[in-house]
């Protein structure tokens, strides 16, 4: 309390601290979201119809394209949609992203890329969520303009950006963005802007914090992802579920490893 009350005289000490106590990583630091982001691409794939719960894809220790490979760990093959979440298969989501970006209904990869970006932003990514945390960072979700600038128009294709399928590459998200994604899935398709104060006597709470914000993915698709998350945790050791360690007897827990 004394430190907070007299922060001015301690500012030099605080600002030079190598652990940066004034830097709130939860809302100010962008990170690649990793495999948790597969849930977003899976939901977009379901909405766009490029994948269903009965779609099976093979995985031979990764996704192979030309002489290149985006690697994966050892697990059964082929996998269904739920199993791809349960076992966190990289190749499965490479197939989904490639089918999204090469979808002929969009006419060009640039248009398809921007549609993907629009979907992702509807989950709150690539922008400030609008929370009451100070100095919130918006993160970054790339679109065709970014890749045209880097590679030149016509100089890139789906496999150029294939790492986006597993939450790597140029994506930048804050931990708050990721927590919000989990809340969105738990709510089956909508989220509230994260905020600190829920209610307070004689204080008017901004109504924006009570507004449901839906993604562009139909709510009927979310239980399909939840099913895979449930199996990731509760299928038992030796099943291939990557989150078995999170299981707790007597509780129904869903999860996704990153």
Set out the residue ranges of the language-model regions.
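Beta-lactam-recognizing serine transpeptidase/beta-lactamase-like catalytic domain environment
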Residues: 1-35, 40-258
């Amino acid at each position: 309390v004394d430190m907070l009350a007299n922060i001015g005289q301690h500012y030099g000490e605080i600002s030079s601290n190598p652990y940066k106590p004034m830097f709130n990583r939860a809302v100010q630091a962008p990170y690649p979201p990793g495999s948790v982001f597969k849930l977003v691409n899976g939901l977009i794939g379901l909405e766009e119809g490029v994948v269903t719960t009965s779609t099976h894809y093979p995985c031979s220790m990764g996704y192979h394209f030309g002489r290149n490979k985006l690697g994966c760990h050892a697990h059964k093959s082929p996998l269904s949609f739920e199993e791809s979440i349960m076992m966190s298969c990289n190749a499965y989501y490479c197939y989904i992203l490639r089918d999204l970006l090469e979808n002929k209904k969009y006419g060009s990869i640039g248009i398809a890329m921007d549609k993907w970006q629009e979907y992702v932003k509807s989950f709150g990514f690539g922008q400030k969520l609008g929370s009451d945390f100070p100095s919130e960072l918006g993160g970054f979700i790339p679109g065709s303009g970014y890749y045209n600038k880097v590679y030149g128009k016509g100089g890139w294709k789906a496999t150029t950006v294939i790492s986006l399928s597993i939450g790597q590459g140029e994506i930048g998200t804050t931990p708050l963005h990721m927590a919000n994604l989990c809340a969105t899935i738990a709510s089956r398709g909508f989220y509230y802007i994260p905020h600190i104060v829920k209610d307070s006597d004689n204080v008017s709470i901004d109504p924006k914090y009570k507004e449901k914000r839906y993604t562009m993915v139909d709510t009927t698709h979310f239980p399909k992802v939840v099913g895979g998350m449930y199996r990731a945790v509760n299928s038992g050791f030796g099943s291939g579920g990557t989150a078995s360690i999170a299981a707790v007897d007597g509780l129904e827990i869903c999860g996704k490893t990153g």
